[in-house]
């Protein structure tokens, strides 16, 4: 009987991708299969996120909840991977001595060896090093799960914003070779994938080596080549940094219709004083200039962003500037949070005296404004025909289908389940608070 693996994933899309790769590695080496039930698992892995303190503490809480399973099954392997593992290393074993393996984002491919080392030596195995591109070279082929797939094209971050722990937990920016990415995309397309999402902490900083030349490919060139892969109908990329938005990338929105009309471009704040304290490397005017260029290239582009509320020293005036930026840009959605101090980051040394209730009130105001804007944008889509990738059944009604539009909206509609993992045309009939409703359009050629 094959061994079973349970994985709990915290955090970003990169972590979701990494969790899939953990499963692929263990399946290829030992025939391990996934389970949704930790109580029947032979291996339990936590793929962690350290961007915010709450997510970090949740990991140790969840570790405590599976400790009893170790007593019931002494052969159970418990592992901690991801950014908390990279940050804490051996300290995880000190705090939770029943953990067997600790590995970082760049060493997940070594999982089989780490598990074998744990069993051979009788003590926890820890590897949180940064072996750059080795991880990708050691990966087995991906398991194809549908018509949409993530493709990691680079790792790490070299920006060192004062609030962010990612450069310390994932290392500096490292890009995969250009041809390696194209080969993976072509393989995915050959197995029925029609939509790819290119992943990286700063994905638009991609600079991949090209065979036969000393030149490096940027994200714009990579997208142009991916668009030529037979079977690929839609291309996304995330997450971007404003400092890496180039004219060649703006031009790609004109040249490549398969590149979606949606971009997640974190701004974090609308005050130049706060942006400087964060060391983001741009001003609000420069950010708005980027938005103007994007909309000149793709007028209907939908924009989402990240916001940190209550950064040390943020005044009421600073926050009002953020609200003005939200109005000026017309963001479609956001990931917005109250500032969470991270150990080892420069912002930890800044005065953080803003009362918690003030921070909470600011966050609620910001989220309400963006929700209002999102609903207004959704309303303008009513009556339009949207190309939708059918992802599965609706979360609220299993008798309906749910899919995603080019501009990243969820649409629920009636249809045959055989349409799952295909593209269909849907007329939007109504707009709800967070989703759209529609009906399939049969085109007459």
Swiss-Prot record:
Major localization listed first in the record, in broad terms: cytoplasm
Q: What is its EC number?
A: 2.8.4.3
Instruction: Report the GO molecular function annotations.
Output: 4 iron, 4 sulfur cluster binding; metal ion binding; N6-isopentenyladenosine methylthiotransferase activity
Reaction it catalyzes: N(6)-dimethylallyladenosine(37) in tRNA + (sulfur carrier)-SH + AH2 + 2 S-adenosyl-L-methionine = 2-methylsulfanyl-N(6)-dimethylallyladenosine(37) in tRNA + (sulfur carrier)-H + 5'-deoxyadenosine + L-methionine + A + S-adenosyl-L-homocysteine + 2 H(+)
Q: Where in the cell is it found?
A: Cytoplasm
The TRAM domain sits at 379-442
| Quaternary structure and interacting proteins, as annotated | Monomer.
Protein name, entry field:
tRNA-2-methylthio-N(6)-dimethylallyladenosine synthase
The record lists the organism as Dechloromonas aromatica (strain RCB)
**What does UniProt list as this organism's lineage?**
Bacteria, Pseudomonadati, Pseudomonadota, Betaproteobacteria, Rhodocyclales
């Amino acid at each position: 009987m094959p061994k079973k693996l349970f994985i709990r994933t915290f955090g970003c899309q990169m972590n979701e991708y990494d969790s899939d790769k953990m499963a692929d590695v263990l399946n290829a080496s030992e025939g391990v299969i996934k389970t949704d039930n930790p109580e029947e698992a032979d291996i339990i892995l936590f793929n962690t996120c350290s961007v915010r303190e709450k997510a970090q503490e949740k990991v140790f809480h969840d570790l405590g909840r599976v400790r009893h399973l170790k007593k019931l099954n002494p052969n159970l392997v418990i592992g901690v991977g991801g950014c908390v593992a990279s940050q804490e290393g051996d300290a995880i074993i000190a705090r939770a001595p029943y953990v067997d393996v600790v590995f970082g984002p760049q060493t997940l491919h070594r999982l089989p060896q780490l598990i074998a080392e744990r069993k051979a030596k009788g003590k926890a195995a820890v590897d949180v090093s940064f072996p750059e591109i080795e991880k990708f070279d050691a990966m087995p082929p991906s398991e194809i799960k549908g018509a949409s797939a993530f493709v990691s094209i680079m790792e790490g971050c070299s920006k060192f914003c004062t609030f962010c722990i990612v450069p310390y937990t994932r290392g500096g920016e490292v890009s995969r070779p250009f041809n390696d990415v194209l080969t993976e995309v072509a393989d995915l397309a050959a197995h029925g994938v029609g939509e790819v999402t290119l992943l990286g902490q700063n994905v638009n900083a991609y600079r991949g080596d090209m065979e036969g030349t000393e030149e490096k490919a940027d994200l714009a060139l990579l997208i142009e080549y991916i668009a030529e892969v037979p079977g690929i109908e839609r291309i996304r990329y995330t997450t971007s940094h404003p400092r890496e938005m180039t004219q060649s990338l703006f031009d790609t929105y004109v040249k490549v219709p398969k590149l979606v009309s949606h971009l997640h471009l974190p701004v974090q704040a609308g005050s130049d004083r706060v942006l400087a304290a964060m060391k983001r490397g741009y001003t609000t005017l420069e950010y708005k200039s980027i938005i103007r260029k994007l909309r000149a290239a793709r007028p209907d582009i939908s924009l989402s962003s990240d916001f940190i509320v209550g950064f040390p020293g943020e005044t009421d005036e600073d926050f009002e500037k953020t609200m003005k930026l939200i109005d000026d840009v017309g963001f479609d959605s956001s990931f917005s949070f109250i500032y969470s101090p991270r150990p080892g980051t420069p912002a930890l040394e800044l005065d953080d005296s803003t009362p918690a209730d003030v921070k909470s009130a600011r966050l609620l105001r910001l989220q309400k404004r963006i929700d209002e804007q999102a609903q207004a944008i959704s309303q303008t889509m009513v009556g339009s025909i949207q190309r939708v990738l059918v992802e599965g059944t609706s979360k609220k009604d299993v008798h309906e289908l749910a899919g995603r539009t080019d501009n990243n909206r969820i649409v629920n509609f009636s249809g045959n389940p055989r349409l799952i993992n295909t593209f269909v045309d849907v007329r939007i009939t109504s707009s709800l608070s967070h989703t759209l409703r529609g009906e399939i359009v049969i085109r007459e050629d």
